[in-house]
Design a protein with these regions (language model features):
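Catalytic center-proximal scaffold of phosphoryl-transfer enzymes
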Residues: 1-388
Length: 388
């Protein structure tokens, strides 16, 4: 299983057979690897939900952490492509000056990757942010490109972080202006861009922005110039590179760009690979822990989750068998609904309909036989003929 996280499934099968004489099928390796990955996704989702719900005290952090995030495309089935988002967190080491340049390195880099949208990525990544103690770290910087979802991610996790626009990304914008001014690939364009990048790195963005504003006035029809000027003006505070270097911060997002290649593309973007969408996150979860050198720490959680899922399946199957043995309830005959009359009933004759209904006691008529029947005392009294 662990081999299949590092290499394609069939290569893992061949390695086990050739090196260890262990015979397993590719289907078995695929099934077990995906099950382990899905279990770890469930573990991390539960942890993230608990952190968001209970807001536990943050773990102790480092003196100086840097965070960087980016996206990488992976191939899905049916010719589709989807963006995997990755967050990388590392400890910043003291800057070292080499050949008149400050060199800043990071260590203990860890990763969190998911195939989700930006709004889902923010709370899900809490699990790694909390584990690294980002909230309690004394200093935190976020080196990103200028995408809005990245700035939202920084605001979500550490709003007071020092925000640094990736230097290569800023240089790309300036290079586009040079290509538009002097022609794509011309020596003049390359020379102009190189001079401005050196100026940006060692002097900051102020003079460059002034020059770009003047160029826009001279070339009002040049859309690429107007677009990139607006982009850079909005992020002027994130391009104070001389100050950032003096503070010992990295000014490039190479940490996460390497993560895109190492964590994501090396395993999910190989020749001929096309993934089911539901299988991407399980593999990413396992890639995160092997590339962060945390397999030994996290594997017990995976085993525990797999056991929990197996018990739940057994209980569910047992309950289904119990319900299947129960006698079926006796069928209750259905009463057919009464059919509505196709025609309304005929009206009663007027004299019948209007005949008042009698209520209360009624006296017998004068000639009723009961009038002449002896009842009560009259029964014992002599008749008139007898008295006469």
């Amino acid at each position: 299983m662990r081999l299949a996280v590092w290499m394609p499934f069939q290569q893992a099968v061949n390695f086990l057979s050739d090196m260890l004489s262990v015979q397993v099928s590719k289907a078995q390796v695929v099934r077990q690897t995906e099950a382990a990955g899905a279990a770890y996704v469930s573990v991390q989702n539960e942890q993230a939900e608990r952190i968001e719900r209970e807001a536990p005290e943050a773990l102790p952090g480092s003196d100086k952490l840097v965070m960087s995030a980016d996206g990488a495309m992976v191939p899905l089935r049916k010719g589709e492509w989807a963006e995997v988002k990755t967050l990388a967190i590392g400890e910043v080491q003291p800057a070292v000056k080499k050949q008149h340049e400050w060199v800043v390195r990071t260590r203990n880099i860890s990763y969190f990757s998911r195939l989700v949208n930006a709004a889902q990525f923010e709370p899900l990544s809490l699990v790694e942010v909390h584990r690294r103690g980002l909230e309690k770290s004394r200093q935190v910087a976020a080196v990103m490109d200028g995408a809005e979802w990245l700035q939202s991610l920084v605001t979500y996790h550490r709003p007071d972080a020092v925000r640094i626009l990736d230097f290569a990304h800023a240089g790309q914008r300036i290079g586009q202006v040079g290509q538009a001014l002097f022609g794509e690939g011309t020596p003049q364009a390359n020379q102009w861009s190189s001079q401005r990048l050196h100026q940006l790195k060692h002097e900051g963005p102020q003079d460059i922005l002034v020059e770009l504003r003047q160029l826009q006035q001279q070339h009002p029809q040049m859309e690429i110039l107007a677009e990139n000027l607006a982009y850079l003006e909005k992020r002027e505070a994130q391009m104070q590179y001389p100050h950032f270097q003096e503070q010992g911060w990295p000014i490039g997002s190479g940490m996460v760009e390497s993560a895109n290649k190492l964590v994501v593309e090396a395993r999910l973007k190989g020749a001929g690979m096309h993934w089911e969408r539901s299988h991407v996150n399980p593999m990413l979860a396992l890639r995160n822990i092997v590339c962060s050198d945390r397999w030994t720490d996290e594997w017990p959680l995976i085993v525990q989750q797999l056991g929990k899922q197996a018990r739940e399946r057994r209980n569910s199957n047992r309950e289904q068998r119990r319900l299947a043995r129960l006698p079926e309830p006796s069928a209750i005959p259905e009463v057919p609904p009464m059919e509505a009359l196709s025609e309304p009933p005929e009206k009663l004759p007027k004299e019948v309909a209007e005949k008042p209904e009698q209520s209360g006691p009624r006296k017998p008529a004068a000639n009723h036989p009961w009038r002449n029947s002896p009842i009560g005392r009259a029964l014992y009294m002599p008749s008139k003929d007898a008295r006469n």
